[in-house]
Amino acid sequence: QFFAIDYFNKVIRLACLLHDSGHSSFSHQFTRVSTIKKMMSDPDLFKKLWGNITVGELYKSSPVVIEHEHYSIRCAYQILLDTDVLASGINPIDVLSIMETTSSTPSDLFCEHAKHFWEFIVGETNESAPTLVRELLSSIISGEVDADRADYMLRDGFHSSVTIGGFNLDHLLSNLRFGWAPNEPWLGLAVTSKGLSALEDFVYSRYQMYRHVYAHKTALGFDWLLREAINEVLEDQSISEYVQLCLTDLNEFRHLTDNYFWECFRNYSRKNPASYSYCIINRIKLKHIDTQLNLSAEQVDSNKGLLAKKLNIPLEEVVTCTMNARFSKIRENFNEMRVLVKDPISHQHELKLITEVSSFFNKFTDGTITHFYKKPSILVS
């Protein structure tokens, strides 16, 4: 059982370290660039990325749309292969199997350790143990309360000098348990009733970070300028061809960094002062003129026209940026995580759905934030 715990500890730490290794330049903004989207919609891109490597163990079929998570799997595969983690007693397929997008079956070693791990938690054997343990580990990598969110919320709150992203991580972690409901069967993370308030703080803090930091008018405005600047420099055939090469060749993909595009922006802005690249290099921001919540696409267009009329400017000078402010997946039938409740009379513990214990998660809903801007005069002229 000790060796099983040690093995899963190493597997999950490796998965946490590698799960975002497929992010390219400027993280999520890169894959939102319209020209990049077209490149990544190439039906042969997945096959080109993997070359002669057999991926049957990882994917049952080639994905229709390539996302950064697919690049993370490709990068993680190569890193684990090059560092020869197999010689250290860790099967790379086990690390990849708990990361997003894969549909792989864990190794025999994983299954053996899962059985011992299961006996440690439950005290008896179960044929479904490998599957249930893999799903449990996957939820820690990518779930409603995962390692990534716990990390970036505190980090982003600190570096943006705000307190709204704060929550008591130590209290939350100390009140997390393994939950096991044998009648279903269900295995997953459970939070004690004492730690439920920390979970509520965690979810609400993330919601507030999206509303006030990630969807801040200045942040979204520069995100828009950045995407347009990337589109702009990709009009150069040599740059476009190199980026396409990077998206299919892992040796080149590692060179597709922020610095690469910053140099492209500098070169382009010297020759073209009335450009998005010039705005990015010289920190010329969009002029914010309005913010609206939860607008439909038709309402966005309508408000855009009204603003253009009020300001007496052409419609094309008004720019919009929209971000989804997702509150939480925790709703009435949410089953990925439960609450461990102690009966005050029998003193027996039982697992309940989070919404059966807390009404907090029904008080908020997902929404959208749309900012409206006027283009800088340098772009208009």
Regions from the language model: what does each represent?
Residues 1-14, 22-290:
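Sequence-structural signature of the catalytic-core scaffold of metal-dependent phosphohydrolases
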Residues 213, 218, 227, 237-381:
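Terminal helices and disordered tails flanking the catalytic cores of nucleotide-processing hydrolases
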